[in-house]
Every structure is written in structure tokens, then in C-alpha cells.
Amino acid sequence: MQDEPTPTELIKAVADFLRNEVTPVIKGHNAFKLRVGINALDLVARQLALEPDNDAAEAARLSGLLGMQGSLGELNRALADRIAKGEVDLRTPGLADHLWQTTMDKLAVDQPNYASYKRELEGKGRA
């Protein structure tokens, strides 16, 4: 098995090549489509880099909140069921913090340049 380069490094290298070498010579609608493709590669690179740790942390928080073990999908379904039944709400200790952290982790992958996300990282967001 080949260890280097990692899938993340390969994706970043392709995205950088497209961004730096190909984008300057492409015009019009094809340039737009190229930027969409580069953005998709950047998103996949962030998913590979961040999601395993984010998912593990989310599952650990949910296990603590719900007092049960399971896959991330199972735990999220259990949380949704308990919310729907009125057993859990924003007054439940730890739930608001869990939801906030989960949102921040997802933004780090999906929209790291989102202005509100950046403000929160700088400590100027949520009071």
C-alpha cells in the first residue's frame, strides 16, 4: 500500500494545478464550470481532512447526551425522536452546545469562508 501522497494531498495538488495553471487560460462559461469543479475538489479535501474527527466528536457528544451508544446516524435519529417526543429540548443540559459545535464543524467543511463562521472563530459571534 502506498502511503504518500495521501488522497487529500492528491486532491489539493489537482485543485491547485487547475486553479493556478488552467484557470488563467480558460474564459467565459467554461471558467465558471472550472471554478465549480475546483470548489468541489476543495470541499472533498476538507471532508477527508476534517470529517473523521468531527464525526467522532459528534458521536461522543451524542452518546453523552443520550446515554446510549450507536453509529452517528443512529444517535442522530435517536436525538430527533426524543426532540419530536418532547423528551429533549434546548433546556436539556449540553444540547445547545452540542448543536452549536456540530454546526461549526459542518461549516468548517462546507463553508469555511462564511462570514458568520469566521466571526465566530474570531470570538465576535455568539454571546
Language-model features: locations:
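N-terminal interaction modules that seed assembly of large macromolecular complexes
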Residues: 17-47
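Short alpha-helix boundary/capping elements
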Residues: 39-49, 70, 103-107
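C-terminal amphipathic alpha-helical interaction region
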Residues: 4, 8-16, 30, 58-127
